[in-house]
Amino acid sequence: PAKALRLAAIGAVMLGAGAAFAYAAGWLGETRLTPQRIIDTFEAQAGHYPGYRKNHAKGLCVSGYFQPSGQAASLSTARAFSQPRVPVIGRFAIGGANPFAPDTGIPVRSLAIELSTDVGQVWRTGMNNPPVLAVSTPQAFYEQVLAGAPDPATGKRDPGRLQAFSAAHPESGAFRQWAAGYKPSNSFASTQYHSINAFRLIDASGAAHPVPWQLEPQTAFAALPAQVHDK
């Protein structure tokens, strides 16, 4: 009997651990948010496009170099800030899951870059043209995607759903204010980009400095024409 009780206890522990793992993986229940649910929502709205990214699907790749000024070397010992020239690969894109969407249809533009140093250090950062994000959690982002889904009957966004989302997420006000006054430029190259998170730069003394990236274009701003032939 004692051995049977021990085996039963072990089995209960293993069953509980398995159930916890399944719950964390999103295998149990239909309300838990998972990456797959977000992907499915993108595809339900924009369509299924095999071989393309599920968000920021339309874009173009670039290559170049990063030449540090030396000013950041006091904030970080990272080689990216002391190497004379750092090779860079990147990708410009517009927001959304449709790779054939018109360039002018979505205000959000993005730039993702990877810096590879000569000592093997690799930096990656994702940046958008808005200086702020509308929300800060995956759940809130999922709710934002649902709120912006077009109404099947009209093909347009439902103002009531958008208002309800805004009321539930007052932190999105800064993003809405930016979007209301946004004037798009006529090129990715004349757009300013902001990192969507801050990086902890560690200096020679071990002190940490949270620093966001911001890329300011050298190309002069020119407004996007009112009528654009989008290919």
Question: Each predicted region: which residue ranges?
Answer:
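Active-site-adjacent core segments of small-molecule enzymes
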Residues: 1-231
